[in-house]
């Protein structure tokens, strides 16, 4: 059985790209939800405290993280190598956002640490690695 699609790209490239795009679009939706006061009211108190007291630089970093991640995924699926650099910018945004989140002094539970802090970092780092792999294999050029 042949593992490559008609475009000469392994089938997993499309699956990983699509799943990563969905993940990052969820981040974009979350960003817009946090900008809406009515939606923000539905968040838990600990989450609202982080969002409401967030400085402009952290909000900007969050925007770079989520919009960069979504744009990078679109570029990856379009097989453009610039996706790698967009993912690097996105990871930088994630790290700055996490710097603020960890600095607010809220005691996070294990689930919150995994969902709010570790998963975005892991996903952003993975996408950098994966886009570099895709370049090496000639899937994006």
Question: Language-model segments: what does each one mean?
Answer:
Residues 1-141:
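Topology signature of small-to-medium multi-pass alpha-helical membrane proteins
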